[in-house]
Amino acid sequence: MSNINRYVTVAGVAVYAAPDGIVQEQPCAVDSEVTLATISHPTTTINMMGSYDVADTANVDNVQVTISCQSVIEAMELLKHESFVARFAMLTEDASTGLSDYTGFTAYFSGHVQSSGGGTAGVGSAADSTIVVNCSKYRLLQGSVELINMDRLRGTLVIMGVDKRSKLNKLLEGR
């Protein structure tokens, strides 16, 4: 058996607006659900013993974050902004000690809201709502360790410490 820490469950989530890169003190949404970005690469199909899809790992397809709020009011508060921070804590079991503790994660993302669900209102319901953000910037941290850093405006794509665009950027800059 390997000594891999177990990330058991998400214990709490808070979403903050971050206008001009400054995180607001109070969250806009608490105990909401955040679907973190999926990083997928565009592919080109070539013929090599049949068809074969080759991923262009220096580029990414559309990067989206979905925030499911517990009320329409929370979603409306988020709609006023283009930069966000989602913080969540996971209950973690340390493989070496067997002890449980919390691990903090932070997702910084900015872009344009693609869609906003109008929500559902019914007797006894919370009138929940969902917004989808198309991200031009996305950065995910586990504590202070950077897991993903994608910035379309700067041509940055770093995944688990590996700069996926460094060679391409050097060629484009003539270095």
Residue ranges and their predicted role:
Residues C69-I73, M90-S96, G111-S115, C135-L140:
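Beta-strand elements of well-folded, non-transmembrane domains
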Residues Y7-A11, S83-R87, N134:
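A short, compositionally biased
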Residues D20-G21, G98-S100, S144-V145:
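Detector for glycine-centered tight turns/loop "hinges" at secondary-structure junctions
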Residues E77-A107:
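Short, acidic/charged, Gly/Pro-enriched secondary-structure junctions
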Residues G50, D61-V65, E82-A86, T103-F105, ...:
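A generic structural signal for short beta-strands and their flanking turns/coil linkers
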Residues H112-R175:
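Mixed-charge, glycine-accented linear interaction segment located at domain edges/termini
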Residues M1-R6, A75-E82:
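Short linear motifs in intrinsically disordered
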Residues M1-Q70, S110-A121, V162-G174:
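Solvent-exposed edge beta-strands and adjacent loop segments
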